[in-house]
Amino acid sequence: MSNTSLLICASQCWPAQPDTTANSLNRLLAQQALQRSGWRGRLLLTLLHLRCGRVLLGGLLDLSLPGIMAHYHWRKQHIASWVQQHIEQQRIQQLIVVGAGFDGLGATLSAKYKHLQVIEIDRSATISVKLAALHKLNALSPNLCMKAADLSCSSLQQLLAETAEFFPDRATLVLAEGVLMYLAQPAINAMLQQLRQSVAAPLYLIATQMQLAPCGRPRFFKQRWLADMALMLSDEPFV
């Protein structure tokens, strides 16, 4: 699991979150993902369960990405709200989540909206861990489809064409949260063009983007050298 995925899972397990149904599934899914992600995941989960461990993690985050936990909480809360607004107001029948990671939004929405076909796309290792976790939590709805693909080197259009659960004539919402900063501009352009060519019905997009630093590369506003080092060591640089 990448350092970014570990951090996002940690944000879902942080005790300060409100106890809603969606947050509960996100927390349980994140815990399962950390347990299945080697020694780093298990160590992080242990630290999160201890008050002194959370103090230590909070200190490290203040030295690397101050405010990142609050950012993740705010972002996920508002994205979930925007997605549900689109589903209900635009009569969305299909949700494609690009780079779904270990987020529980797709599982939550597929259970809530039985008419909604949800297709989650991520790398094979992530999909494998997430499928096992959802099975254990009994949270895998029939209208939730998970597809393994590396979109930095594969065609989204071909993947969708080969997916029996994909319906090109359904009003579709695409969610790309925390994905675009890992793709070069030509890859982003190709992905958007392939989506437009794949869907014959109304198509909507909700995506996150990062501001560019003076060097011209994506970067968090308060990103410090410790975060730079972690991204470099885990081979997940923003492009």
Each language-model region and where it sits:
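A short, conserved alpha-helix within the catalytic core of class I
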Residues: M146, S155-L159, Y182-Q197
